[in-house]
């Protein structure tokens, strides 16, 4: 099977397996603010990541590329929608284009239709400095995502089995590539120990890519003759991973992704410490169901709904939203307690804007 054929299968299986909504975000509840003293017109949703200013705390997370015409059309539509809504967009792994020049167009279209937007290049942790620079140049990218997908590779029939040297390669790329580097998980979550190593390696941010969204173990198991189903429930749920990493490194930039389905999930993620939230499966389904117009409408609604929630929480800015009070219960509370994290960090903190 060619890489392009595999990419097409990934899209098909991502749509068929869907999102399984075990993110843990249901365990997070806002403390209601009765006197927000704020108008929606005052809300400022700008956020800063790696020295870059995003107009919105929402971004289109890495999905696809390198699968011929079908992935070309998906990336083209996503980028058009990103341009229309001023939302950053990430491409899927560009390794296919580095190995087959005919696939470059499936990625380059993102910059072609969105010449002034924020675009993330993307490679796996096996990449070299040379490959990282080529990926960034291909898109004139503003940032580089490096994805960690050990479980996906293990379950993938033709996947990698040797993960030695990844941290050293990431550190070398972060030092040399010339744009901010974000390291992201792909649906299995990130622990505070992994995040610590990555921050020490010099990355600008981590995207925790929590369990609860697109499940790459399930996707790859659909492609196997003998399934490895024990990996289908493997990972740290989004809410637990995000809270664990943020509370351990409150001064570092953390991004949220993994099963984020609506504005409430976005708002909760930011309250847990994220500087921005990435959606992939939600946008892919929106595009499939409603085309470009439907996708753009959903993106606009998402942004407006976040503003309304910020208003009722009395949070004028993203930084103020990151200080709002939330109560964590259920499995997420249990996880954090067992990991030595005091959840009153979130529930009793004060923000003078609230009352």
Curated annotation (Swiss-Prot):
FMN binds at residues 62-64, 93, 122, 184, 214, 258-259, 280-281. Substrate binds at residues 6-7, 152. PANTHER family: ISOPENTENYL-DIPHOSPHATE DELTA-ISOMERASE. It holds the Pfam family FMN_dh. GO terms for cellular component: cytoplasm. Belongs to the IPP isomerase type 2 family. Keywords: Cytoplasm, Flavoprotein, FMN, Isomerase, Isoprene biosynthesis, Magnesium, Metal-binding, NADP. It catalyses: isopentenyl diphosphate = dimethylallyl diphosphate. Involved in the biosynthesis of isoprenoids. Catalyzes the 1,3-allylic rearrangement of the homoallylic substrate isopentenyl (IPP) to its allylic isomer, dimethylallyl diphosphate (DMAPP). Its cofactor is FMN; NADPH; Mg(2+). GO terms for molecular function: FMN binding; isopentenyl-diphosphate delta-isomerase activity; magnesium ion binding; NADPH binding; oxidoreductase activity. The gene is fni. CDD domains: IDI-2_FMN. The keyword Cell membrane does not apply. InterPro entries: Aldolase_TIM (IPR013785), FMN-dep_DH (IPR000262), IPdP_isomerase (IPR011179). SUPFAM superfamilies: FMN-linked oxidoreductases. This is Isopentenyl-diphosphate delta-isomerase. GO terms for biological process: isoprenoid biosynthetic process. Its EC number is 5.3.3.2. It is found in: Cytoplasm. Homooctamer. Dimer of tetramers. It comes from Bacillus pumilus (strain SAFR-032). SMART domains: IMPDH. Mg(2+) binds at residue 153. The keyword Cytoplasm applies.
């Amino acid at each position: 099977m060619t890489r392009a054929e595999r990419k097409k299968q990934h899209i098909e299986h991502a749509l068929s397996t869907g999102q399984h909504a075990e993110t843990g975000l249901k365990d997070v509840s806002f403390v209601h603010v009765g006197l927000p003293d704020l108008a929606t017109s005052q809300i400022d949703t700008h956020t800063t990541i790696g020295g870059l200013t995003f107009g919105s705390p929402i971004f289109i997370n890495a999905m696809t590329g390198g699968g011929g015409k079908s992935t070309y059309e998906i990336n083209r539509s996503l980028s058009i929608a990103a341009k229309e809504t001023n939302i950053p967009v990430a491409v899927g792994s560009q390794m296919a284009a580095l190995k087959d020049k005919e696939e470059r167009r499936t990625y380059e279209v993102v910059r072609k239709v969105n010449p002034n937007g924020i675009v993330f290049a993307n490679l796996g942790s096996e990449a070299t400095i040379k490959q990282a620079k080529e990926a960034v140049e291909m898109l004139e990218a503003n940032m580089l995502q490096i994805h960690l997908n050990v479980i996906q590779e293990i379950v993938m029939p033709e996947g990698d089995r040797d993960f030695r040297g990844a941290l050293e390669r990431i550190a070398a790329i972060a030092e040399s590539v010339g744009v901010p580097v974000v390291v992201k998980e792909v649906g299995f979550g990130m622990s505070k120990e992994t995040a610590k190593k990555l921050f020490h390696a010099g990355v600008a941010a981590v995207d925790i890519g929590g369990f609860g969204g697109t499940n790459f173990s399930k996707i790859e198991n659909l492609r196997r003759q003998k399934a490895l189903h024990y990996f289908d429930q493997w990972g740290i749920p989004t809410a637990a991973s995000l809270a664990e990493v943020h509370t351990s490194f409150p001064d570092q930039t953390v991004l949220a992704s993994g099963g984020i389905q609506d504005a409430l999930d976005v708002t909760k993620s930011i309250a847990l410490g994220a500087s921005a939230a990435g959606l992939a499966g939600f946008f892919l389904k929106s595009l499939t169901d409603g085309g470009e117009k439907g996708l753009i409408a959903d993106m606009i609604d998402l942004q407006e709904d976040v503003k309304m929630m910020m208003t009722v929480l009395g949070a004028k800015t993203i930084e103020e939203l990151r200080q709002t009070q939330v109560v964590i219960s259920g499995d997420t509370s249990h996880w954090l307690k067992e990991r030595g994290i005091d959840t009153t960090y979130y529930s009793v903190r004060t923000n003078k804007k609230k009352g």
